[in-house]
């Protein structure tokens, strides 16, 4: 919850961060994207390290790094310092999350008991994603944006003091003795280059040499990643598993879901504070209905999954999310319509949670016990890469519309609307993906994926 919460608790503080540290243009989104990139890029590597060296050990080490990076980020005096601290935070989170998830799956037996535990895990992730906006607003208003990072330190210290007592060590004696560092490096750097190309294209030009060369470099690095994984004795991400239809489609849906959630929160933060002029506290409180929708929808999603199956439940969630985002985009205005915007937010968030819980269950539901750690790592990696892509893409859309428009308030509102239209389109694509390709994949009523 702490690692997921930190993704969004910083989002509400972005306008304050931008003003105080002097971020220019679309650079401020790297405060979010940098965290997600290092987090997502190292998840599988850290998961493998946990199997090899001990999950409790990785959990403790990751939490310690996370706390130290939070302290450093809170003391940041320049944009690059904050981005660097967020990158380091992502490293800590990458060690923390797969270790906690592996400890969870090792604790609970298979079947319904494990499904319930995974459902709670998915629900906590979704609730943390929304709750961070509220807490971020309160903290930024009364204590300043630096405290959205400082607050992690006492929480981490408390958990670190209890971990040796309440958490039993767990590791896989069959885990490989080598770590695929080349795979982790090429995947992370490749995606970083692609995201940089997209995020900076509105300023450099979509066909500028910088954009083209950066995108080409990212493509080459991702191609090298595939080659490395095919030849590695102990690959970071075994391609035969990722090539299974069920695993591939589910994680593709997770990426799209995360893009939608990240884009929505980014746009609404700018709308409330930059377009409407609300304070961080007021903006944070406007996310309370959305958070309430998460809390209510989480158990409902579990019930629907038991009744309808994962695919049908997730598909309904994406349909509801798309409808809610269309509602919000249609009502954005600097002169009113706030109630309609809030209602659309509630609808979109309810749909998000209804999609999130079954996808979390499905992502680890059809692999063997010896593959659950990998499947959990792939799920978390897909989530973080989706977040990074969502922030970069929506920032690029907003910037492109603003650059092509007359400027001022109308250009900002137009960019925000297009950002939400883009998020709604991504949700619709996820819906189509599930309908067309999952077939019996995650449609099993009380089971996970069945890859043809």
Give residue ranges: language-model regions.
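12-transmembrane solute porter fold
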Residues: 1-12, 31, 209-221, 234-404, ...
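Transmembrane-helix bundle of Major Facilitator Superfamily
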Residues: 1-165, 300, 308, 319, ...
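Short helix-kink/termination motifs in transmembrane helices of multi-pass secondary transporters
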Residues: 2-13, 38-41, 55, 148, ...
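Interfacial helix-cap and linker-helix signal at transmembrane-aqueous boundaries
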Residues: 17-18, 49-50, 135-143, 198, ...
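Transmembrane alpha-helical core positions of polytopic small-molecule transporters
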Residues: 61, 94, 129, 187, ...
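Cytoplasmic-side transmembrane-helix entry/capping segments in multi-pass membrane proteins
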Residues: 61, 113-125, 176-186, 211, ...
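A residue-level signal for alpha-helical anchor/packing sites in multi-pass solute transporters
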Residues: 103, 107, 138, 162, ...
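Hydrophobic transmembrane-helix bundles of small-molecule transporters
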Residues: 119, 141-254, 260, 278, ...
